Amino acid sequence: IHRLAAILAEGLKRAGVTVTNRSFFDTLRIDLGARALSVYQATQAAGYNLRQAASGELGIAVDEKTTADDIGALVKLISGVAIDVATLDAHVAANDPAAALLRTDAILTHPVFNCHHTEHGMLRYLKKLQNRDLALDHSMISLGSCTMKLNATSEMIPVTWAEFGDMHPFAPLDQAQGYLEMIESLTE
């Protein structure tokens, strides 16, 4: 994710676009001045949801579903300049400033990370922790939460569907009509 965001940042910078956040993981903020609204509308029309930030600025979030083709298309939509993503990828790999942010101290030093040397040993340890946990499927809460206890697991399956759970965080209201209808019905 970060690599694609870094490629996007480099491509935009080379095309003359100001990237305002120096440090980032997956989200860029760009300053387009008076062009921000027209670029926002063009990206919306192309199927990309950007965030309208401060006056003249847009936010771009890169996630697991973003591809190299998306990066090229976004740079072209925003700047009008076509880029070679592979060339930028090589440049970003060689000049990654995030290397300075990598952890250098000792990690996983707690004894639990060093005392289980087999898969079955680790599974036994995890099962022991699980058995200590108090959960609704192993106990009963005497007061309240009746609805929660009675909901069948199958009723919860839709929550895992992409159509339900993959709403883009910057999606405009016209793309969230189903969510708005569902929320309205829950308030009645």
Predicted regions, residues:
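Noncatalytic alpha-helical scaffolds and linker/capping helices
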Residues: 42-45, 53-80
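Hard-cation-handling environments
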Residues: 11, 35, 45, 66, ...
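Flexible inter-domain linker/hinge segments
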Residues: 68-142, 146-154, 159-162
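Buried hydrophobic positions in well-ordered alpha/beta secondary-structure cores of metabolic enzymes
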Residues: 1, 28, 60, 144, ...
